[in-house]
Curated annotation (Swiss-Prot):
Protein name listed in UniProt: Putative nucleotidyltransferase MAB21L1
Enzyme class: transferase
Protein's UniProt keywords contain Translocase: no
Annotated binding of a ribonucleoside 5'-triphosphate, by residue: R23, K24, F63, E64, G65, L66, K248, S252, L253, L254, K255
The organism of origin for this protein: Danio rerio
Enzyme Commission number(s) of this protein: 2.7.7.-
Length: 359
């Protein structure tokens, strides 16, 4: 048993050093290329409208606010200033979303975003995004990369297609630190020892973001209140949870396997599903020793089996907001197909670790 475990870990490490690292290097190169173009577009936007200041800064070889969705798809979160005169309200009526309401006694004119406040005093995510989209469209025509970048049509999101190869969504957002949403108040679960009080305090201090984007839990039937709502996002908090042991290595393996074998019709699976399932696996295996290097194979198999179960049940709950289903709106046939493909992959890795050389 131990020999089989060690063999699997050996082949996974080999796969990580060869395939995962080359994937990372290729994506880093793409990110540099993409961020040059996006920075140039955002510089033009800022000239036209100084309230939209580019926050796409490089720190320690990372671009702040950039998320990799897949090797050709990225999201850049553009942090806006001065949320201060608004109250953050998440009463659970819109899963995964919250609203920003003008604080009592505050005048509209005190807000930097005065013309985006609705009659009932809400700061409208849709109105801000609509204005931003117009500015980006103008900037694309003026910027020095105008030959290689164009707007993606037929969407209310702000998306750029670069060199006909990459798609980048630019999402206006507010950073919320020092508060924690009510809809995530159940976390951490009292009976689970992970991640421990110190890490919990760090995660909550990271806070969350409010994004101006279509909320997929609302799926097409948006009332005006819903289109004014902001989408909750916990990227920094989630990253902090995955520090230590082989957690990040495990996620890197899953992303690489997804990119190579689970990029399927209907796009049922993305990297965020993988990140979510690693967090759930941490709860199931709360001891640090469960994430030692020699447990890598067990953890990876556990996550792949959990993924198959989620696909078969057609439900993958968001880690911090379990009422939000990350498979919402995905075609059932695509989820079924993904379950079959994931099962084939898991069986192959488990029964014949050497097959990783070909995967």
């Amino acid at each position: 048993m131990i020999a089989a475990q060690a063999k699997l870990v050996y082949h996974l490490n080999k796969y990580y050093n060869e395939k995962c690292q080359s994937r990372k290097a290729a994506i880093s190169k793409t990110i540099r290329e993409v961020c040059k173009v996006v920075s140039d577009v955002l510089k033009e936007v800022e000239v036209q409208e100084p309230r939209f200041i580019s926050s796409l800064n490089e720190m320690d070889n990372r671009f702040e606010g950039l998320e990799v969705i897949s090797p050709t798809e990225f999201e850049v979160v553009l942090y806006l200033n001065q949320m201060g005169v608004f109250n953050f309200v998440d009463d659970g009526s819109l899963p995964g979303c919250a609203v920003l309401k003008l604080s009592d006694g505050r005048k509209r004119s005190m807000s930097l975003w005065v013309e985006f406040i609705t009659a009932s005093g809400y700061l409208s995510a849709r109105k801000i995004r609509s204005r931003f989209q117009t500015l980006v469209a103008q900037a694309v025509d003026k910027c020095s990369y105008r030959d290689v970048v164009k707007m993606v049509a037929d969407t209310s999101e702000v998306k750029l297609r670069i060199r006909d190869r990459y798609v980048v969504q630019i999402t206006p957002a507010f950073k919320c630190t020092g508060i924690w949403p009510r809809s995530a108040a159940h976390w951490p679960l009292p009976h689970i020892p992970w991640p421990g009080p110190n890490r919990v305090a760090e995660v909550k201090a990271e806070g969350f973001n409010l994004l101006s984007k279509e909320c997929y839990s609302l799926n097409g039937k948006q009332s005006s209140a819903e289109s004014d709502a902001w989408v909750l996002q916990f990227a920094e908090a989630e990253n902090r949870l995955l520090l230590g042991g082989c957690r990040k290595k495990c996620l890197s393996l899953l992303k690489t396997l997804r990119d190579r074998h689970l990029e399927l019709p209907g796009q049922p699976l993305n990297n965020y599903h993988m990140k979510t399932l690693v967090s759930y696996e941490c709860e199931k295996h709360p001891r640090e020793s469960d994430w030692d290097e020699n447990c890598l194979g067990d953890r990876l198999n556990g996550i792949l089996l959990q993924l198959i179960s989620c696909l078969q049940c057609r439900r993958c709950p968001h880690y911090f907001l379990p009422n939000l289903d990350l498979f919402q709106g995905k075609p059932h046939s695509a989820l079924e197909n993904a379950a079959k493909q994931t099962w084939r992959l898991a069986r192959e890795i488990l029964t014949n670790p050497k097959s990783l050389e070909k995967l």
